Amino acid sequence: MTSTNIDNRVPIEKTIEVIVKNDKGEEVKVIKRYQEYQITVKRNRKVDERKKWKKFGECDNKTGLENTAYGDEQFLVLTRGAEVKEEEKDVVKCRICKKNHFTTKCPYKDALELTTQPQKSEKEEKPISNKYIAPNLRGGYTGSAPSGSDVPSIMVSNLSQNATEKDLYELFGQFGPVSRVSIPKSMEGSSKGFAYVTYNHLDSAEKALKQLNGHRYDYLVLSLEFAKKKSLN
């Protein structure tokens, strides 16, 4: 490390007399006065030792900066607004279809409300009468037909908008008798992309679920699952 210290408080004044010729050719004495400062220089001993090394090769006869080589000139380019994008974590999950959107925005919301809508029993609709009613005509009697909670209903997602109820009857009817097919429609009258298929028997619904889940239908792959709540309507 080399540093220089100048002490302005202790200048050394010196005078120089110089004889010069003016424009007329006459000799004139010029007196110059100046101040000399004491400068203290600290040098690095290791640097001074390296300067005494013997030069060789192409730098044998060169001195000073002549034997200093510079690398390629590099320009610094600063880009503004460069950010690394991180993968967005899915923090929103629908409670109906388990996909990444709010439950209120779920396209299957309307259809689920239809299947989960409670039905009025015959006891609520008909007033109580003192007249005798046969057991097979009394409210709540369904005979051998399954109750609403036992009806096997399948929700078919990722359905082509070109599919009709007739198409689904033919597709799902090969596994057993189908009692009902429902394709919810939008305000414009087009399919919402899913449907509900209700079987008469649970084993038929299980066969359809096993065979058609992941089945390619009209350039789409069907996704099947049992509806959370089954209804005859």
From Swiss-Prot:
GO biological process terms held by the UniProt record: formation of cytoplasmic translation initiation complex
Pfam families in the record: eIF3g, RRM_1
Oligomeric and partner information: Component of the eukaryotic translation initiation factor 3 (eIF-3) complex.
Keyword terms, alphabetized: Cytoplasm, Initiation factor, Protein biosynthesis, RNA-binding
HAMAP family, A to Z: eIF3g
Chief location of this protein within or outside the cell: cytoplasm
Name of the protein: Eukaryotic translation initiation factor 3 subunit G
Function: RNA-binding component of the eukaryotic translation initiation factor 3 (eIF-3) complex, which is involved in protein synthesis of a specialized repertoire of mRNAs and, together with other initiation factors, stimulates binding of mRNA and methionyl-tRNAi to the 40S ribosome. The eIF-3 complex specifically targets and initiates translation of a subset of mRNAs involved in cell proliferation. This subunit can bind 18S rRNA.
Residue span(s) of domain RRM: 152-229
Name of the encoding gene: eif3G
